[in-house]
């Protein structure tokens, strides 16, 4: 089967020096917050990696555009094309891959952003509960997940019951590869009875999902979480 979209994430090599976000210290604050949504620089921006394996560059660019506030160090993206070219540059400078097809390690891209002076710190958030707490109390998170063929398409049952577009996770479908996406929202207690979900900001243009975004249930993410998740800040800690 030919995949309708291109992926491009690699599993980070283990490094005991990785800083882990101290989410346990934020747990009390997170318990009082159910919902957090971060707004893109332009809510109409939907960058598209096309047929290139640059999801790590594009996902990190989405994270920059959905930061918790306006950061003086972050790039000022004036158009989708400028954001797209920034993402490609981040990928190339991280990997040296002029084919734009070999994929990238998420940690390396975070390190490159730090080298450029665009961020001051980046942290690993390896567990699902760490991701949830980081989203509720800190800011957007990037997640690397195995991408099954079912996930290219929506879950019609959930969409019918709760609206929007939900990622369909069927672990019995074929594994297409690994994908890096920005998570720019979370709702742990939807008021319409829907399951708790993460809002993902994909890099496949506005034609995928709900104008380029989708909901991934937290339970589905638990089944997928086996790779790497990162968050970053313009501040040094």
Question: Where would I find each of the regions flagged by the language model?
Answer:
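Catalytic-core signature of thiol
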Residues: 1-237
């Amino acid at each position: 089967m030919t995949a309708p979209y291109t992926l491009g994430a690699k599993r980070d090599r283990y490094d005991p020096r990785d800083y882990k976000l101290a989410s346990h210290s934020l747990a009390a604050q997170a318990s009082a917050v159910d919902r957090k949504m971060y707004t893109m620089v332009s809510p109409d921006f939907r960058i598209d990696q096309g047929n290139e394996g640059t999801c790590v560059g594009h996902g990190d660019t989405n994270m920059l555009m959905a930061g918790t506030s306006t950061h003086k160090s972050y790039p000022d993206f004036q158009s989708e094309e400028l954001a797209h070219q920034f993402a490609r540059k981040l990928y190339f400078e991280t990997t040296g891959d002029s084919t734009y097809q070999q994929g990238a390690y998420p940690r390396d891209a975070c390190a490159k952003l730090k080298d450029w002076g665009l961020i001051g710190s980046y942290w690993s958030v390896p567990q699902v509960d760490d991701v949830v707490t980081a989203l509720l109390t800190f800011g957007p998170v990037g997640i690397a997940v195995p991408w099954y063929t079912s996930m290219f398409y929506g879950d019609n049952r959930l969409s019918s019951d709760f609206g929007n577009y939900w990622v369909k996770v069927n672990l019995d479908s074929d594994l297409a590869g690994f994908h890096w996406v920005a998570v720019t929202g979370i709702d742990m207690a939807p008021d319409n009875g829907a399951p708790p979900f993460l809002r993902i900001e994909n890099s496949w243009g506005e034609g995928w999902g709900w104008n380029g975004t989708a909901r991934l249930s937290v339970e589905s993410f638990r089944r997928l979480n086996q790779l790497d998740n990162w968050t970053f800040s313009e501040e040094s800690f």
